[in-house]
Amino acid sequence: MLLQGALLLLLALPSHGEDNMEDPPLPKGACAGWMAGIPGHPGHNGTPGRDGRDGTPGEKGEKGDPGLVGPKGDTGETGITGIEGPRGFPGTPGRKGEPGESAYVYRSAFSVGLERQVTVPNVPIRFTKIFYNQQNHYDGTTGKFLCNIPGLYYFSYHITVYLKDVKVSLYKNDKALLFTHDQFQDKNVDQASGSVLLYLEKGDQVWLQVYEGENHNGVYADNVNDSTFTGFLLYHNIVE
C-alpha cells in the first residue's frame, strides 16, 4: 500500500524538464504493474427502443373450445311447401260421447186381407183379416186408412182374381188415383196388383174399391187364396 501511494504522488508532481516535452507513455498490458480501480455503480436504464418488425407467422394452433351459444336470430321467411308425406297411423279412439237426445219415431202402418169374396162393387172393399194394425190407423168397418201423421206413404195391393174379370181402383179422398184391370181366364186363378207412393196430409183417407159394375167384381179370397191391402209411412213431415 505504501508503494502504491508513493507512485501516485510522483505522478501528480510537475515535470522539471521542458514544457513542450511529451509525457512518457503509460505502460501497457496487465504485467505493467498497474492495478485496476474500484468498479463504478451501474448506469441508469436507457429509453425503450422502438417496436421491432412483425415476426413471421407461427404454426397453426390447436382447435379451441366451442364458444357460447349466441342469441336467437330473427325468424326467417316461410319456406316452400314440401311434398305430401305418407299417411300416418290411426290415432287412438276418442272418449265415448254423451248420449244424445232421444228421437221420437213416428209409426203408421197396416196390412190386411179379405176373408171372403167381394160381392158389392163401387164401394170401399172391407179387408177384415188383420195382419198388422197396431196404430189402428186402418178401420176394418169402413175399409179405409185414415192419415194421422202427415208425410210420404207407400201403398200396395195384391188381388186374387177368380170367376170374373177385375177392375180395381185405389182412391184418395173420393178420387181414383190408380187403376188395375185383369181379365179372368176360364178355370184359372189369376193375380192383379198395384203400388204407389202418396203424400198425405192429416185427415186424408185411402181405400180400394171395384169399379164399373158387377161384371168386373172378380176379387176373390178363401182359406188358401188371399187378397191383401198394405200401407205404411216412409217419413213424416211434422215440424217439431
Curated annotation (Swiss-Prot):
Start-end of Basic and acidic residues biased regions: 50-65
Q: Which residues carry this modification: S-(2-succinyl)cysteine?
A: 31
Q: Please outline how this chain is modified post-translation.
A: HMW complexes are more extensively glycosylated than smaller oligomers. Hydroxylation and glycosylation of the lysine residues within the collagen-like domain of adiponectin seem to be critically involved in regulating the formation and/or secretion of HMW complexes and consequently contribute to the insulin-sensitizing activity of adiponectin in hepatocytes. O-glycosylated. O-linked glycans on hydroxylysine residues consist of Glc-Gal disaccharides bound to the oxygen atom of post-translationally added hydroxyl groups. O-linked glycosylations elsewhere disialylated with the structure Neu5Acalpha2->8Neu5Acalpha2->3Gal. Sialylated by alpha 2,8-sialyltransferase III. Desialylated forms are rapidly cleared from the circulation. Not N-glycosylated.
Sites where 4-hydroxyproline occurs are at 39, 42, 48, 86
Its Gene Ontology cellular component terms are:
cell periphery; cell surface; collagen trimer; endoplasmic reticulum; extracellular space; perinuclear region of cytoplasm
**Superkingdom classification of source:** Eukaryota
Per the entry, what modulates this protein's activity? Polymerization and secretion of adiponectin is inhibited by succination of cysteine residues by the Krebs cycle intermediate fumarate, which leads to S-(2-succinyl)cysteine residues.
Q: What sequence ranges are listed for the domain C1q?
A: 103-240
Which keywords label this protein? Collagen, Disulfide bond, Glycoprotein, Hormone, Hydroxylation, Repeat, Secreted, Signal
> Residue ranges of region Disordered?
29-100
KW Protein transport (keyword) present: no
Marked site, Not hydroxylated, at: 57, 66, 71, 90, 99
- Name the InterPro entries for this protein: C1q_dom, Collagen, Collagen/C1q_domain, Tumour_necrosis_fac-like_dom
GO BP term, pick one = brown fat cell differentiation
**Cellular location(s):** Secreted
Glycosylation positions in this chain: 28, 60, 63, 72, 96
State one molecular function term (GO).
Answer: identical protein binding
Q: Which residues belong to the signal peptide in this entry?
A: 1-17
User: Any additional notes?
Assistant: HMW-complex blood contents are higher in females than in males, are increased in males by castration and decreased again upon subsequent testosterone treatment, which blocks HMW-complex secretion.
Spell out the subunit comment: Homomultimer. Forms trimers, hexamers and 12- to 18-mers. The trimers (low molecular weight complexes / LMW) are assembled via non-covalent interactions of the collagen-like domains in a triple helix and hydrophobic interactions within the globular C1q domain. Several trimers can associate to form disulfide-linked hexamers (middle molecular weight complexes / MMW) and larger complexes (higher molecular weight / HMW). The HMW-complex assembly is also modulated by the degree of lysine hydroxylation and glycosylation.
Q: What is this protein called?
A: Adiponectin
Look up and give the organism this protein is from: Bos taurus
Q: Specify the taxonomic lineage.
A: Eukaryota, Metazoa, Chordata, Craniata, Vertebrata
Q: Which gene encodes it?
A: ADIPOQ
